[in-house]
């Protein structure tokens, strides 16, 4: 049975648990515990990680209430284990399963799955790929919390393949999430080194224990990331509880991270609410993304390279935002910006970009002034499909960008303006600074070059650079007055709510409809006579 089949079967088991009140997120947490136990069993590593009496067969041999009680005891015991990595994975873990039949069904079904491909058993990487598939499934179903900003795997793959991590390079993700960037970086290095077999023993040990470092603020997410790393044979620094540390990048934890040769990350979007920015940055700001940008510049080794997913506001925000962009273009060679399409994150409407840069320059890694000369921009946003479940974002959508980016990880491959994928030639051009004195044919290209001097004089150091006109865009001058727009929107909402109310009553949910109507009346301060 291949991994896709196993992922589908494991996910299907969730239906039984959901009937018992277990959410998708909690189900993934349950699977994280059970999959670790099963992985140790199938790969013959139980003695390496698990104490006697707390292994897969010990859980499987019990039934009913005894099995559920033992499972609870097992989680507590492993969370206090002498092995720091096991302790980190199971620290403060508890189960949301309340009925013995649920854990019995889960264990027996997992045990009955065909974990083998022909005569070959599953490797740790096989279990890791399977686990990543489950995380992807969870992101598809969980459109709030961490799930809404789950970085699409095709984008992660492209970023890592362009950065080209090498053996003995430290790769850092200061907003690790479920460790997707680190896992892909490890996968890339293994693909270039015959699964590390071409490396000497000391370098192999470096790759397993020191090459990949992440920091994650949320304990539950950090646990998922640790499990992901461990299942991919990335153990990390055992003194720090594995490859993913728990802490706040915008505080002292971020300052204590070791310097990196590569940073690949997707910092959390949104305001600074809930995030305690206690670190002193050169340009103090409450904008989380701008603080992360400063951290990345600081944490890179001279000559190190980075790719960072940022929302549009990082490109144009004034004040400290302008200062930080100037700092970036001074201290780093910002060579490439990829404008991403909307809809590729589960938070619909989020507009994002990827900034690719090198600290200093390749010629002089310690250079800290005037490092940026030309910035190349690829527009993968304008007039692209609305991506989502029905139109998935795939590797093919990124291939034209990969081709023009070139083979050099610092963006120094020979480049030529002009790339017309996805019917770009049919696109109208905007009346903007970007298109002044520009050949009409080139103005329809998705791939353009802009000088540092032009960015300074024409854009006042804004990096919000676009030149193609969206066919669905509306001229602001032709819009109605704001109060008219607001009234129209309110009218459409009232109509939609009325139709939903009628539908709920037709479906026999009158009590729920009455409750929702009451909540609406309370929200608007009651109905006025």
Swiss-Prot record:
The subtype gamma methyltransferase (M) subunit of a type I restriction enzyme. In the presence of the R subunit the complex can also act as an endonuclease, binding to the same target sequence but cutting the DNA some distance from this site. Whether the DNA is cut or modified depends on the methylation state of the target sequence. When the target site is unmodified, the DNA is cut. This is Type I restriction enzyme EcoKI methylase subunit. GO terms for cellular component: cytosol; type I site-specific deoxyribonuclease complex. GO terms for biological process: DNA restriction-modification system; methylation. The gene is hsdM. The type I restriction/modification system is composed of three polypeptides R, M and S. The restriction enzyme has stoichiometry R(2)M(2)S(1). The methyltransferase is composed of M(2)S(1). Keywords: DNA-binding, Host-virus interaction, Methyltransferase, Restriction system, S-adenosyl-L-methionine, Transferase. The lineage of its organism: Bacteria, Pseudomonadati, Pseudomonadota, Gammaproteobacteria, Enterobacterales. Induction: Encoded in the hsd locus, in the order hsdR-hsdM-hsdS. There is a promoter upstream of hsdR and another between hsdR and hsdM. This probably allows expression of the methylase enzyme before the restriction-specific subunit. S-adenosyl-L-methionine binds at residues 148-153, 178-180, 216. The keyword DNA-binding applies. Its EC number is 2.1.1.72.
